[in-house]
């Protein structure tokens, strides 16, 4: 995995805003190939160089590498599904989901009865999510994929283990059920969630647009040779798209914001997050699953 500033011809790649999320289903073989790159040289170089990327970005890279290495490859069930977040032909985020389960059988605590009246089942479990540390909001965008395919889902469980991840989940409406699990019912949070005409859950009051890179159809697959570069034109969403890093300076009208630039650190996508039933696996469960990893 390597994110360059310019394409192979030395030119600038162009980006547009699209209503379709840049998330695609992939197979197990592709997932395992790509997950290794999230604890490869590029990510560890970012983690080891806070003076170049900032303490925040380097810490994020370290967490990404640790999670990808520890939990990326294991024996998945037949219900496991895999998704890739694409910018052009570059895979910049991965997610693995599992099927749902009975809350009565799974949860040690019985608080879910009062927290989620009328619900007996978790419909989907997200047990792994990693994103490139220089691409902002990739994790949020990945969460939309299971919802798009299962629009009747209403109760989500999200795996835990990282304090920052738990804090963000709480901001999205996830609530603690027991020591290992956080669960979301978007219907309980009309201030945070809304449904589209297609019955898809989206985070409320967010622009429903995604950053998409222009690519030939032949190269629109997950690859390690993609180039993420600067926008060549200013758009009406520039002030939403760009996150400029420590100096806080806005881009010039001539160059536009950088999608990948070590000085500007990362990009924030215009998007609307879709809520899904998600399960968050706790540390003990993650350790158990690691013990099942194939050699």
Curated annotation (Swiss-Prot):
It comes from the Bacteria. Keywords: Nodulation, Plasmid. Induction: In bacterial-plant-symbiosis, this protein is encoded by a bacterial gene which is inducible by plant 4',7-dihydroxy-isoflavone or derivatives. Residues 1-20 are annotated as: Disordered. Belongs to the NopP family. This is Host-inducible protein A.
């Amino acid at each position: 995995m390597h994110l360059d500033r310019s394409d192979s011809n030395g030119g600038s790649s162009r980006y547009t805003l699209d209503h379709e999320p840049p998330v695609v289903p992939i197979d197990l073989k592709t997932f395992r190939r790509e997950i290794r790159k999230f604890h490869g040289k590029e990510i560890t170089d970012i983690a080891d160089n806070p003076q170049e990327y900032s303490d925040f970005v380097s810490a994020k890279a370290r967490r990404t590498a640790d999670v990808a290495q520890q939990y990326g490859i294991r024996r998945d069930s037949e219900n496991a599904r895999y998704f890739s977040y694409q910018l052009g032909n570059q895979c910049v985020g991965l997610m693995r989901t599992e099927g749902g389960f009975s809350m009565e059988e799974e949860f040690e605590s019985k608080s879910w009865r009062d927290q989620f009246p009328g619900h007996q089942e978790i419909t989907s479990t997200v047990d792994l999510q990693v994103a490139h540390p220089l691409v902002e909001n990739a994790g949020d965008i990945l969460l939309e994929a299971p919802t798009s395919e299962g629009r009747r889902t209403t109760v989500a469980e999200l795996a835990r283990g990282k304090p920052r991840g738990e804090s963000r989940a709480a901001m999205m409406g996830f609530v603690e059920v027991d020591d290992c699990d956080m669960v979301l019912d978007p219907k309980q949070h009309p201030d945070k969630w809304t449904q589209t005409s297609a019955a898809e859950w989206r985070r409320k009051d967010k622009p429903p647009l995604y950053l998409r890179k222009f690519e030939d159809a032949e190269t629109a697959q997950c690859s390690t040779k993609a180039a993420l570069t600067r926008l060549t034109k200013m758009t009406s969403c520039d002030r939403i798209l760009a996150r400029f890093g420590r100096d806080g300076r806005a881009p010039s009208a001539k160059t536009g914001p950088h999608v990948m630039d070590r000085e500007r650190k990362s990009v924030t996508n215009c998007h609307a997050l879709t809520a899904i039933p998600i399960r968050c696996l706790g540390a003990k469960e993650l350790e158990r699953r690691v013990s099942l990893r194939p050699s």
